[in-house]
Amino acid sequence: MLVSYQWLKQYVDLDGISAEEVAEKLTRGGIEVDIIHDLNQGATGVVVGHVLECRQHPNADKLNLCQVEIGEEEPVQIVCGAPNVAAGQKVAVAKVGAVLPGNFKIKKAKLRGELSQGMICSLQELGVENKFVQKEFADGIYVFSDDVEIGSDALEALNRYDQVLELDLTPNRSDCLNMYGVAYEVAALFDKEVHWPTAESSGTDGQASDYVSVEIEDIEKNPYYGATIIKNVKVGPSPLWLQNRLIAAGIRPISNVVDVTNYVLLEYGQPLHAFDYDRLGSNKVVTRLAKEGEKMVTLDDVERTLQADHLLITNGRDPVAIAGVMGGATSEVQEDTTTVLLEAAYFDPATVRKASRDLGLRSDSSSRFEKGVDPKRVREAAARAATLIAEVAGGTVVGGVVEAGELAIEEPVVSLNLPHMNQRLGMELSHDEVAAIFDRLGFAYTVENDTFEVTAPSRRGDIRIEEDLFEEVARLYGYDNIPTTFPVGGTTRGGLTDYQQKRRKIRRYLEGAGLFEVMTYSLTSEEKEKGLQGENEDYLPIRVAMPMSEERSTMRTSLVPHLLDVVQYNLNRKQEALFIYELGSVFLSKEETLTKQPEEREMLAGALTGFWTEHLWQGEKKAVDFFVVKGILEGMFAELGLSEKVTFERGEQPGMHPGRTANVKVNGRAVGFAGQIHPERQSELDLKETYVFQLDVESLLTEEGTEVAYEPLPRFPAISRDIALVVDENVTAAQLQQVIEANGGEWLKHVYLFDLYEGEHMEAGKKSIAFSLTYFDPERTLTDEEVTAVHEQILKELEASTGAVLRG
């Protein structure tokens, strides 16, 4: 929106307030001013001249010698090449010494042997953009009307001392797409009064209903239509003041009738359209929806193909305008027009927006209709335009307005709670201060206790909720005046909780052991959830109400399927070995239909495949196996101080290898499992031998760990004894180790499993397990007899509790 500062001063007293101050105030009030255009552009010394004589240059076919009166004692001779220069014209003359935009200085000069003492100017040479210049002056000099005084300042006559504010409006402030809204905004910001001209059209000659009837077929898309008749008009150029205001606002003057409709559009924000009444083709106006494929030629001489949801203005048969977008060429106001039908209507914003978008046709009218115009100003704008047309085109307004439909004027009441507003804005405004702001804005209100019931004017369609009023109060009070406050709160010593510290230990240990952390989706498919839930197999899959896809339709109950997806993805991309883990949540419920939030439980899972060590000169490469996984977990439990509480027991889990899977228990309570994926499942997923583990982190970390105890380096030698035991194949090494540690006494410091044998030379159903036992006393050197006694006691207990016998 381009706002002329001089035009704005007609409505608001801005004496002593510069355009720059207005721009600053508007910007700080939420109406951003992008730039201030200075129309003068540094021009000086241009006056109104009168061409007394014009004859052809003796030495040039396309030049003229002009004698021009410029308000001085003697006329001056000027050489002019404009094709439209003629005697009797009043023109803009840049005198010798004048400066034109671009710092172009005018000097005396000889052109083809003839002296030229100045320059007769076109509007473009005075800084007017070519697109705003009237067609008749586009290729030549500008000609003033006869009422302009000779010798007066031509720049002032052309309003070139004006400044234009370019507003960058947000979509909610369409009320400022017109001078009416801007005037009230500026008046509110500066606490001024608005002096708005009264708009009354007093038609006296006959009744408009004798000329035309109006009918609306779709009242939802066209709630109101009004037609005013102005007869005996004489179409011609607009007066200079009207042309100047249109040019300043970025609109090219066309003719007095059309210029008035554009002027009122800028003034009120209400789009109007002027039809040549005699070219309508009937005395009837009917608004209706287009027929699919119906065609019409618009004012830009383009044939448009219409759709069935486009709203048209018709003469009862043929379309004469696309409602709210553009008029038709057949009913255009032309030089011989004598009777004008002036349209003032309210069209549905969505209907106008769709037609404009479908046709690729955007106009000043459509841009306002699609944002919603003020229904309260429709009739007022029509009356203002009718009066101006009669004034500038010499017409007579026919009595009455022919109307159809009704204007629904909505002014919603919005409540504002003062303490709530102060709390939200961080201010302490009183009732009187808030009331004064609403008075400046022109908002009606009532007050009861701390509550304001506020009614905004119909032009302010953006005021709908309490927060809108908060914004208005803050804008008018001044954002810069809102006190700056900093958050207040006591400082506390930062630190991680015990749970967080343990989680960090897990991450640090696993990464040190060579595993990489991954993060996978919390959503999966129901099919993938089957068969690998581990200890969560009794829980039902939880489907999402509106999934993005079937691949992400179910909340996970296990981390393992997701890790296997990661393994599969990387193996397919030539990664031969992969060691990964994830700390994440699973979602558990035993209800088919959820009546409460599912249980969210944090789990730790890992997946390992490929070679654990590479083939180097120090030794052969080693593939991942169950004991690698078990060793990693034992190291992690040692880091957490849980070594003495954790046991691995042979077990079975869905989707896991039956002979290479162990249940992990802490103090006899199951917290997870570790083992190899079942070969059939590996084959389905096209995986190599892959091992996984999954632990319930919350159950694990709630256990109290043993504190690390530091001991001095031993001064006395230790004694080691190896034992190889033959046991039933269902007896685990962990069971044997527990018996050994329970009966080894204080001298037994370490128990290390170093051999497991099954196969040839072993009785069926039996296996051999060998341990190395280390005995040590920090106070003295142990004797063989002392160690042998303890060792034999261990063997007796092993035989009694597990049936183990010493291997011969």
From Swiss-Prot:
Mg(2+) binds at D462, D468, E471, E472. GO terms for molecular function: ATP binding; catalytic activity, acting on a protein; magnesium ion binding; phenylalanine-tRNA ligase activity; transferase activity; tRNA binding. It is an enzyme of class 6 (ligase). Residues 409-484 form the B5 domain. It comes from the Bacteria. It is found in: Cytoplasm. Pfam families: B3_4, B5, FDX-ACB, tRNA_bind, tRNA_synthFbeta. Its cofactor is Mg(2+). Residues 40-155 form the tRNA-binding domain. HAMAP family: Phe_tRNA_synth_beta1 (MF_00283). This is Phenylalanine--tRNA ligase beta subunit. It comes from Halalkalibacterium halodurans (strain ATCC BAA-125 / DSM 18197 / FERM 7344 / JCM 9153 / C-125) (Bacillus halodurans). The lineage of its organism: Bacteria, Bacillati, Bacillota, Bacilli, Bacillales.
